[in-house]
Structure formats: structure tokens, C-alpha cells
Amino acid sequence: MCGDRNFKAAAKYELHEMGHLSSHQRGLLMTFVGVLFLTPDALLLRLVDADHWTLMFWRSLIAGCCLFALNGISQKTNPIKAVAELFRNGLFCSLFFAGSNACFVFSITHTVAANTLVILAVMPFIAAVLTLLFMATKLALRTWITIVVAMAGIVVVFWGRFGQGDIGGNIVGDVVAVFCALFMAATLVAIARNPKINTLVAVGVGALLAALFALAMGADPRAPSGEDFIYLAINGGIVIPVAMALITHGPKFISAAEVSLIMLLETVLGPLWVWLVLAEQPGQQTFM
């Protein structure tokens, strides 16, 4: 009994301390937890035996529906009214996320997973530039230093790839990964610029737009097997909704560049899961 009382007292103390976190600390914590949820994303996509359009369709459709369900549970708002409000206040956020979603799936299926995730390290730089252009917000020197280090990783990934006959192969996936970073950075800046955006609805609409785009491009919804649907359900039903709900809430408390820097954790852990499960070893430049 004494041990049970001590446990309850400790739990209450932890909740009390959490309540005293500053808004900046809450933003950092939410983003960090969200990125941890996101790290298996690349692995779950690689485990599905389907073309990229079909992957994009199911991943986006399931995620979009779950994000709307989360919004209904947490916000208790009418989904039709929420979408109507989005058209006045956040449509660009949805379009940017749709582009990021589509580019990520295309890239992860057209190049080594580690390359896609490492190239996404350009996201903090893009977010910083967009923040300066559209929000006139100055970033701390340490943030810029971290961004420069991340950019150096991009140079290492691309180093030696050109001129070696790889132009028509993996390089396409690498280039699309850069556009993925651009769209995701724009999504975060759009939220930071207008914190009143209902991010669950905005990202949910973006996911559904990506699903419609994939269907128009030739997705075959019947292609995945039963086992494939398990991975798709985990990815679209748990990983993406939880991760995006937390990550897209981050820019309401911290800068978009800071959110992008925390997302570099996926660059470290994402390729590790793919390597451990599928033995897909990153290239020498990427591994460095």
C-alpha cells in the first residue's frame, strides 16, 4: 500500500511539473515526441510490396481519415465547418502538406531510404529562409550554426553522385526529397505565421488531397496484400496521425526552424530501422 501511495504521489508530482513547463518547452516536447513517432515511417513504407502511387493513396487516405477522427474527438467541431474555416484560414497549409506527403512517398520508393531522410536535413535552412521572408523573425546564432552543419550533410550525400551514371536512377528520388523538404518547411512556416490554424484539419485535408492525386495518377487500391494492409494501417492509422498532430502543433510555440531541426532526429533513426530490419545499408557518403 505504501509503495502504491508513493507511486501515485510521484505521478502527481510529474504531472504538476509538466503543467509548469513554459510554452517554448511544451513546443519542444511535443515536437520531440512527434518526431519519435515518425521515425518508423520509412521502414513501414519499405515493408509494403506496392507501387508508389498505391502506397501514397493508402497511407494518405488512412492518415487523413484518422486525423479528422482525432479532430472530432479532441476539438468536437463539425468537420464540414472545420473544412470551410480552413478555406479562409489555412488552405495553403493543406496544399503544402499534400505536396510534402506525395514527394516523401515518391522519394522513399525511388532512392535509398537513408538518402531521402538525410536530404530532408535541408528543411531547417528552408524554414529559416521562409521565416525571414514571410515573418521577419530573427533566429538565434546557434540555430544558424546547426542549420549550416545540416546543410553540410546534404553536400556529402550528393558528393560524387553526379557524373557516375546515376542521373536517371536514384538521383530522381534524391531531387524529389529536396522538394519534400521545401513543402514541409512551408507547412511549418504557414502554421507558425497563423497559429489559429486547426492543424489536425489542415493536415487531414492535405493527406486526403494527396490520396486523390495518387488515385488520379494510377493507384491500384486492390494491390496490397493482407500483410501489406497491416503495415499501411500502422503507418497511416497510428504513426502519421500521432506524429503530425504533435509536430504541426509545435510551430505554435516554437519557431518553424526549431521544429525542422528536431525533425532531424528522423534522419538519424529512420535509416537505422530500415538497416536493422531490411539490411538496406546506406551508401558510404550517406552513412558518414
Label every PLM stretch briefly.
Residues 5-57, 61, 65, 95, ...:
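Glycine-/small-residue-enriched transmembrane alpha-helix faces in small-molecule transporters
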Residues 54, 61-65, 105-138, 257-275:
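Specific alpha-helical transmembrane segments that line the substrate/conduction pathway
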Residues 59, 84, 117-120, 136-156, ...:
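Loop-to-transmembrane alpha-helix entry segments
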Residues 116-122, 190-209, 240-276:
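Helix-helix packing/entry segments at the starts of transmembrane helices
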